[in-house]
Amino acid sequence: PEPSIRTVSLPHRGKGNAVREGLILANGKIRLMCDADLAMSVEQIDKFLHKMAEGYDVVIGSREVKGPRRFDEPKLRHFMGKIFNWYVRIVAVGGFSDTQCGYKCFTSIAANILFKRQKLDGWSFDVELLMMATRKSMKIFELPIDWYHKERSKVSFGPASIQMVRDTLLTRI
């Protein structure tokens, strides 16, 4: 069958909720989530598909592993991202350099298992997904991607940071 696109309208309950609902409703064998600001160029999608073809259950985009380039990112944002990922490795799930990159790819089986169990509606849902995938012994690859900083972010830096720290702690409960 040919790929199709459909839109879904949801009440605003956070990024985690929107991604969960979208990937549960999706019906492809491979399901890619990407940030709406397209901070990663669409030309890089092939890299995800090649890794999925190698048998990975989950492929996550990473700005922190060796190889990617970052364009126009403010130094404070980069620093805060490194601190948060350090915190995640200690508190929740180790082994990942960049849990918060908005580009992740799942097999349909992995997506159905993970998103039907995902609870967090906010910005830290990625941590919860990776923790569950690790506990389920899913095969995960962290893929270097080039990333372009976009100013039109909907994230309110201070309140979002506090919520992310709190939500990451909740993943342990």
Ranges and model annotations:
Residues P1-V8:
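Acidic donor-binding segment of Leloir-type glycosyltransferases
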Residues L10-L25, I30, V42-W123, K150-I162, ...:
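Acceptor/aglycone-binding surface of glycosyltransferases and processive sugar-polymer synthases
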Residues L38-A39:
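Acidic metal-phosphate-binding loop of nucleotide-sugar-dependent transferases
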Residues G95, R117-D121, L130-Y148:
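Catalytic donor-sugar/metal-binding loop of nucleotide-sugar-dependent glycosyltransferases
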Residues V127:
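Short alpha-helical elements of helix-turn-helix
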Residues D167-I173:
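C-terminal, non-catalytic tails of nucleotide-sugar-dependent glycosyltransferases
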